[in-house]
Amino acid sequence: GMYEYQLEAEMTHEFLHHGERQHAYTPIIGSGGNACILHYISNDNIIKKNDLVLIDAGSEYDYYASDVTRTFPANGKFSGEHRAIYEIVLAAQLAGIKAVKPGTAWNQIDKIVTKIITQGLIDIGLLKGTLDDLIEKQACTPFYMHRSGHWIGLDTHDAGRYKINDKWRKLEPGMVRTVEPGIYISADTPGVPARWHNLG
């Protein structure tokens, strides 16, 4: 195949074709193990047939930023391991989106997403123990090392506090945030069978 930067060029063409004049941030196009590197921007490897491809990109339109992350199989067909990870992340994202409403505390969305990801990793055998103990120990951190989202608006990571007077901020009408959980299993993640390696 195609190089990651060639896929970036196709995406950039579509953005420009539809009126976007600039990216909201440097696009991330990661295939295979590169999909497991947060904020990977080299975009210079060949995409292999059995890789998962992660695109994290956004356009800027009328001064407002967007931020979209999607993962798909390069060959168009999920393997069993690909599908298992994809479905856990999708379930976490959908639950997080459902929780975004006025009155919900910022960290409540993180808790919902983390619970679903942790349970999913238990279900597929990558974590062992009880759900509550694993959440308390933050056992999913080697696989999911960031929060569920951030403010977005005139900037991709828009200004705004997550806490006020040391209390988690509650969402209000007009606030905009992302919900973008993920699972990243690099080849050097300890104790993980090889069939799960390089999934992100």
Give the positions of each predicted feature.
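Active-site neighborhoods and metal-handling regions in enzymes and metal-associated proteins
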Residues: G1-G200
